[in-house]
Each structure stands twice: as C-alpha cells, then as structure tokens.
Amino acid sequence: MAVTDKERKLAATLSDPVLWGQAYLYNRDGSGRDYWPHQVEDLRCPAKNIIHLDGRDVGKSIVLSTDALHYAFTTRGGQGLIAAPHQGHLDTIIEEIEFQLDSNPDLMNSIALTKYGKPKIHRKPYFRLEFTNGSVLYFRPAGAYGDAFRSLHVGRVWVDEGAWLTERAWKALRQCLKAGGTLRIYSTPNGLRDTTYYRLTSSEQFHVFRWPSWLNPLWTEDREAELLEFYGGRD
C-alpha cells in the first residue's frame, strides 16, 4: 500500500525533535512552540555526547524538555534520566513538562494509566513519567553522592547545571548510562577547572556548544552591558 502524504508528513515530524516540538508543544502565551537557530542546532545534533557552556536566558531548559519529551513520545520502551544537582533545578524542568502535558491532549494521552484510570505521573519519592509505549522518564537530584542514580540503567541522560555536580555524583551518574547511550549536559560554567564537567568540555568525545546570552533574540544592549560590567568581561 502506498504511503500517503499525511503519513509521510507524520513520519517526518516524529523523526525530527524540532518539527515534533513545533507540532506538539506550546509557549506560555498559547502560541505554538518555535525554536531559535541555536536551539535547532542542538536538537538536531546527532552526536552521542553533547556538552554546553551557556550564558543565561538562552533557552537551554526549553531544549532539554523538548528533547526529553520527544524521546519518550517516539521511543518504544525507552528509559531516560533527567538529572540535576538539586531538586530546585529539576522543578523548573518538571513545571515546563507538566505545562506541556496540560496544554496538549494528544501529549497527555501518551501518558500511561494506572488500573484506576489515573495518569502514571509519580511524584514520590521522585518525579517519574510512564508512557503508553513503555517509555519512562526519571527525574533525580544528584545530591552530594548521586545516591538517587544508583538504581537506574537508562539509554539517555540529560544533565541540567552539570557544572555543579559533585565528583561522586558524576561517577554514580556515568554508571547508570547504558553502553552506547546518549549523554547531553547543559550548564552555565562556574569557573572551576578541577572538575569532571570542565574536563568533558575539552574532551574529543564530546560535541561542545557555547551559547552566550546574546544569542537570545530578545537580548538587549543594556542587559549585555550590565552583565559585562558585573562579570568583568566576556570570558
């Protein structure tokens, strides 16, 4: 049977996180989600290992949440971990993901149901989403030692504010990623050099993104001058 144009378009949308995000996700004002050029570059990057050195307000949380939702929505039986130094970092991402679920019935319908008909959105002891295709997204804070990571074995990991993970947490995190899995690390650098995060930013095994704050199309010269004065320069 010949593939219809509608089926061809759907296949293209599902295979591309940018097209998928534009089709399924929304901005807070209710308009359809769109992405800045630097966000598109990240979302379409095929590298297994990605690390960021980002400024403020460049939209990294939007990219992380888009990629995580796209992965879970389109990967049968996939398991992914969203990790961050502390629960407060995760709460921002969780809030964005819950907003998207509430905004699109098709997305909410992709969440599996309990035997009582309730969505499998678990909040205790840690936030977890289970999807009808068998995919699971885990959200875990690293804490000092990465104890919350130790029971997991996943195919994809997203790290928010990776510069602030402790060395022991990094070790625990690496052990929960399956061989051949994908690791995407997002962070604003903290200036510390004797760390796993800093070492990975110069590793040949990682594709490095550097996003200064002025990549944000809404950035202003006044805001740039303010931060340059505060930090003493661009470096």
What do these predicted regions represent?
Residues 2-235:
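Phosphate/NTP-binding elements of NTP-utilizing enzymes
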